Amino acid sequence: MLLADGCAGDQQLLSPGSVRQMTTDQLTQSQRDGGRLFLKGQGWGFGGSVDVVAVDPWNVPGRYGWGGGTGTAAHLTPSTGAVTILFTQLAAAGPVPSALMRDFWHFAAGG
């Protein structure tokens, strides 16, 4: 639905403007700087992170989603149409993603 500008099938559930707002970084530079330990190359839209800088191969500017500290991640990349979902039971021990998550994202990015 988010990749289709708010449409699910033939139903418009969200306006295209709402989808743009959700998936656009809403943080100021100062806020991003304050959260850089956890938001490396990312900002925050409404309900999820938004990649703003290509820090790693999978950080494509515009990628939107959730990289949770409890081992779950779900992202969509509008420029490629890719959707990635990973569910594990490996809670994060700190701000650096686990090797499993990094390997998953690397593979999902075509690496």
Stretches with model-predicted labels:
Residues M1-G111:
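Catalytic loop of the DD-peptidase/beta-lactamase superfamily, centered on the K-T-G motif
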